[in-house]
A protein has these predicted regions:
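Ribosome large-subunit tunnel/peptidyl-transferase-proximal elements
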Residues: 1-76, 98-113
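C-terminal structural segments of small proteins and small subunits
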Residues: 85-86, 91-102
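A short, conserved strand-capping beta-turn/loop at the end of a beta strand
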Residues: 75-88
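Short, flexible micro-motifs
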Residues: 29, 66, 82, 91-94
């Protein structure tokens, strides 16, 4: 059975967060937590929260054992871009794009329903 969790509108660039997400794909939940705890990036902290939420959903809602869970699927979709302005010298104005992401993590025990 499979449980999932999502974090929408996370203010982190999808391209940067995908590099962290590739580290945990297919790993057990215990190993994925260890990897994310030792990775010093903003995206790893956000992904760890989503992983903990997906694990709690599996344990509490589906009565699965935490020791048997692994990360079956995880992906990041780009969210809306927040457009901001940056003032430069000599009255120049540039546009800064703050990219957002939608993070999804699915955990499974490998058994069908």
């Amino acid at each position: 059975m499979e449980a999932y969790a999502m974090h929408k509108m996370a203010i982190v660039a999808p391209r940067k967060a995908r590099m962290t997400l590739d580290l945990i794909r297919g790993k057990s939940v215990k190993d994925a937590r260890a990897i994310l705890n030792n990775t010093n990036t903003k995206s790893s902290r956000l992904i760890l929260k989503v992983l903990n939420s997906a694990t709690a959903n599996a344990v509490n809602n589906l009565n699965l054992k935490e020791e048997e869970l692994f990360v079956s699927e995880c992906f990041i979709n780009p969210g809306p871009v927040l457009k901001r302005i940056k003032f430069g010298s000599r009255t120049k104005v540039d546009r800064r794009d703050k990219r957002t992401s939608h993070i999804t993590v699915k955990v499974s025990d490998g058994k069908e329903a």
